[in-house]
Amino acid sequence: MMNKKVIAVALALALAGGSYAQDDTAKKKVKAYMVSDAHLDTQWNWDIQTTINEYVWNTISQNLFLLKKYPEYVFNFEGGVKYAWMKEYYPEQYEEMKKFIEEGRWHIAGSSWEASDVLVPSVEASIRNIMLGQTYYRQEFGKEGTDIFLPDCFGFGWTLPTIAAHCGLIGFSSQKLDWRNHPFYGKSKHPFTIGLWKGIDGKQVMLAHGYDYGRKWNNEDLSKNKDLEKLAQRTPLNTVYRYYGTGDIGGSPTLGSVRSVEQGIKGDGPVEVISATSDQLFKDYLPFNNHPELPVFDGELLMDVHLSLIHI
């Protein structure tokens, strides 16, 4: 009789636990990878000295402040040449930054020496750009990048996923296709927001559309953010990959944005908020062959604006 009571209690607890687990899953049915960035044009409407004296300084100093103040904050920054300038011109801050890189909170986004145009340069030039960047990252930080991170380049050729895969990279992200004037893939400006991109030789990397990199929030709980929910529901994965921060002149995300991500991580809304590195989504879906739900695109990702511009 006692054994029957023990079994009954155990079953009740198991069923209750399953119910709680289902409730928790229902609450966290949407996932948001929040990818901070401070995209910095090496040279655009200013000279290199302005880049070094103002924009590189703002980027390293502001983000060191945020990393010290907000324990959940993760910062992503691309372009080996900017890291080299940090080392040369701001050595004290550079050494501080290296500690956060080691901890995984300052993330080397992208893998190249320069986040440059990828249409005009030859395949060899693109590979050399990656090799030069990876060599610097390996020598300086003991790490390498794992993705192509190009929030502000003007179109992406069919060779890019092939180049990336043969360089050992696993993912690609941008937000630029939203700048198109006209739809390109049916009624959309891009084939999908998260999926796999197949290159000319059949090699694949994961693709993520980051939306506008200048997005800001003002001290809100992002776990309850309806826009993130809607964006996530555009994919079969119920997941959104979302840039936030600033563009062109470096710097950092706003305080209100960083606080919003922190609140979202601790929040109890339907969105699971992740303060993410630029490659975390891609790593979470490895190996890609185990995820048949990922759509596949086999072709070019072209622009119909900025057609005569080269980006450096």
Question: What are these regions, as identified by a protein language model?
Answer:
Residues 1-2:
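N-terminal secretory signal peptides that target proteins for export/translocation
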Residues 6-15:
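Sec-dependent N-terminal signal peptides
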Residues 16-20:
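C-terminal segment of classical bacterial N-terminal signal peptides
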Residues 22-310:
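Catalytic-domain carbohydrate-binding cleft regions of carbohydrate-active enzymes
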